[in-house]
Each structure stands twice: as C-alpha cells, then as structure tokens.
UniProtKB/Swiss-Prot annotation:
It comes from the Eukaryota. It is an enzyme of class 3 (hydrolase). Its main location: nucleus. This is Probable ATP-dependent RNA helicase DDX52. The lineage of its organism: Eukaryota, Metazoa, Chordata, Craniata, Vertebrata. The modification N6-acetyllysine is found at K15. Pfam families: DEAD, Helicase_C. It comes from Homo sapiens (Human).
Amino acid sequence: MDVHDLFRRLGAGAKFDTRRFSADAARFQIGKRKYDFDSSEVLQGLDFFGNKKSVPGVCGASQTHQKPQNGEKKEESLTERKREQSKKKRKTMTSEIASQEEGATIQWMSSVEAKIEDKKVQRESKLTSGKLENLRKEKINFLRNKHKIHVQGTDLPDPIATFQQLDQEYKINSRLLQNILDAGFQMPTPIQMQAIPVMLHGRELLASAPTGSGKTLAFSIPILMQLKQPANKGFRALIISPTRELASQIHRELIKISEGTGFRIHMIHKAAVAAKKFGPKSSKKFDILVTTPNRLIYLLKQDPPGIDLASVEWLVVDESDKLFEDGKTGFRDQLASIFLACTSHKVRRAMFSATFAYDVEQWCKLNLDNVISVSIGARNSAVETVEQELLFVGSETGKLLAVRELVKKGFNPPVLVFVQSIERAKELFHELIYEGINVDVIHAERTQQQRDNTVHSFRAGKIWVLICTALLARGIDFKGVNLVINYDFPTSSVEYIHRIGRTGRAGNKGKAITFFTEDDKPLLRSVANVIQQAGCPVPEYIKGFQKLLSKQKKKMIKKPLERESISTTPKCFLEKAKDKQKKVTGQNSKKKVALEDKS
C-alpha cells in the first residue's frame, strides 16, 4: 500500500465543500480528475491474474451504476494486489537493510577477528621464538653435558657438533676441510667442539683437556681459518712449546692439514740460520712459526733482533703450565719476553694444557682480555681409557727386579719408561740393554740428531722400550703406546697425569704401572686421588695418608728425592770405567790441539 492509497482509505466517506472553500479548492486544484489518457487503456493494461488477457469493455459511470458489485470486487482485488506488492517491497527493503546490517556486522566482526588473529599470531610467534631459543639452549647444554665440556666466561660461542658446521657457520676453506677429513678426523673431539668456535670469535682462551684429546688440532684449525690466506707480512701466528720434539710434532700436523692452502709454516732448527732467514732484511714471506722459547729468545736478544713479531695476531702456548713454571725447569721469564715482543694491537692469546695450573689460571684472569675458560672432564684428572696400577717394590733394587719380571712374563711393545733424571736414564739403559730387548734412551744430553733418530725409530717400531725423562711426557704423541712404567715416582699429580697420558690416546686402551717405595709415601696421596677419580682401584691404607701442604709440594718438585743408583755394577768397576773415559777424552783433546797447530 502506497501513500495515496492510505490517504484514500482514511478519507473514505468524507467530502470537501468546494463551494464554501472555493478559493482553497482552486488553489489546490481540488475537483474532478482529468485524465490525459483513456481509462480503457489503463483497464486494458491491468493484468491481475498474470494470464496476459486484456479486460474487454470500458468502465464507465453507467457501468458502475449498473454493476456495482463487479466494480467493488475489482477494486478490492486491486487493493489486495497492491497490498501484496507493498508487503513484498517492505520485505525486500527489510531484507536489504538486514543484509546490509548483517554485512556491516560481518565486516566489523571480521576486522575484530583479524585484529584478534594478528595478536594471536604475534603471541604465537613470540612463543615460538622463545621456544626455539630454549630448544637451542637445551641442545647446547645437552651437547656440553654429554661430552663433559665445562665453560666459564661471558657471551659464550656455541659449540660445534661436526666439522661440516665450520663450512655452514664460519665458511671454512674447502681444501682445509677436505684435508681434515682426509686425515681421518671425522668428528671433533670435546675440546675441539668448544675451543675452535671460541678462537674463531676472536676470544682469548684458557683450555684444559686430557692428554691425547686433540688439542693440537683445536688451535691449528682456527688459526688457519682466521689467517685466511698467505700474506707477505711476516709471522702472523706464533706457537710455543716446551720441547723441540713437541714443536716438531705440531709443525708436522700443521703442514698436513694446510696442504694446498699455500700457508708457509716454519720451525726454528738453528738460530744462526733463522736470523738470516727471518731477520729485518728478509722478504717476510712466512705465516706461522712453531718453536721452543729458548731459540726464540736467542733471536730476540740480538741487536738488531733476529726476528720481528710485530705482526703476530695469534700467540698460542702449548703445555702452558710447564712453560709458566718458575726456576730451572720452567720458562716463565722467557715467556714474558716473548709476550712483550708481540706488539700488535690485534694479538690474541690462547693457553692449552692437559692440566690446570693455579698460577696460569690467575695470570690469565688478570692479563687476558675477557678470557674464556674451557675444561674437559674433571680438572687435573687422568684419562679414563688408561688402566692404572700402583705397585709397591720395597726399595730401589726392587724396581729393577720388577722390570725384569715384566720382561720375563712378556709385554706388548711399545713401552715408555719414565725416570726422574738424566743420570738414572743412562743407568737403567745400561741395565736393560743386556736383557735381549730393543731398548734406547732419550734425554737432553744427546744431540738433536740422536734424539730425532730415536723418536723416529720408536714410532717405526724398531725400538720396543724407550727410557726418557719427565720432560718428554709433555705433549708428544707416540701412537700405539701400550704400556707406561713410572720407574721413579712422579713429583706431583700433574706430572703423573702427563706421564700416563702417553698411552690411551685418541680413545685407545692403555696401561700404566707406577712403582713406589717407602720413600715415596709423602707423594702417594695426591697420585692415588687421581687414580681413584679415574675409576681404578687404590689400596685402602693409602687413602689414610696425610696430604702435603702446598709449600712442601713445591719443595719436592724443585728438589726431588735423592735415590740410590740403579746400576748393579760394583763401584770399583764403575770408577775404573770413569777413569778410562777421562783418559780417552783427554787424549782426543790433545790430538785435536796438535792437528790445529799443524794446520
């Protein structure tokens, strides 16, 4: 129903007095309707029933008077039809309004939901990033705990689990990585897992790991990676070791893994030759130097210095606890001079050893910049792959009997025998040479050529038993040593750890037998603790011995026990042999003088 129909219904039966209100009627044009078109056309155009049939006839006044009922019916049907149309319009309008409102509400709801979803995504991303970080930390902690890696410091670099990570994270030279894998190093050892990333981040390092755990490779790989390529700047890396044998071993390992990279790695053999080769007038076509402290100090003290260390970026001290020792057997003064000679602002230092020395640790904390401390397993502990045994022999003569008993029972060579002095090494050699076994001795009084030949023969298996002093126990890797005999009791637990560390290397099994007498009682407790920590049996009565004070320990290290002679030859024969030796040397010296005079 439209507006006109509504007013028509309301005004049904009401009449407007046109006579009385003629002016208003004329103004609003109230009167009879005038149609511009014929009513028949309208009626013919109407189709109430949807059958497209026109209504015949014309609806006039006469017809309405004649058939009022039909007209009323048509009018009612027309009004009903209009009502239905108006209802449909209302429904469509309300449906459109409802749909618009619904669309608006849906749009509003969707925007709200989108905002809620964004917040949820942000929360989830925060949660996932936090979870990922926690998972990463858990993996790192699991790896460190699994391999007994103990780290102290700030901003600790993550350890590596494989050598391939060096390519993924640090872009290692492909040739260097291939050399490492070709050398048989498929997986990094615990010390390599943590020490390599620390040095690659340029952090100064104090590292301690059991003997035979791959410390040489732990500092060699990051040095070669950080130097990147050869450069004519002089030595950029310096590696110090206490013995020439150990320096030679490090030099050999560096050459092996750097093959094809072009690095020039040198070792000082003769100081005079080195002064010409590495002096101020040299071309500086060298990169890495491996040496002992004394030879380097000799070059530094020359005027002008026979070597320039101003370009050194990495200073590595292997067996640092030995080099930091004071006194005749230590190298503390020499090491201080070397540190001062490395004047570059880029220089970083790394200390490696099988044992943690308190002096070294304190010095590193005071002098190294933001140092990181890395240790594998329990500090100052023996290798777990070594079967350790304490054997009471009563007296000095009992030691020689025990060695001969081992020879009779049979042993699996190669064997290392440690004594406390050069004189005792000579005496034991003369006693065992008649036992029918291939035995040799190595000590500081032998020439360098003799020492090199002895080490080479021992590695080749030509020598079954090698007698040596404690200094040789530092770092040298004799592959396949099955037995270590501590003929003379070590002066400290640290020395004991280094001695027995010559066997059981790289995960292989080994055995260590330590002789002790009544005189060794004060030193027993500290060594017994090391043996017990490694899971080996120790007699109960030894555990009850009193501990030595630190002052007493230092005295015993500086002044070892005076022991009886090993030699079983009567003194009279020994004195005659000495006199004969003096006469021979005197005659030889006279002949030399005579030859010089003639010339």
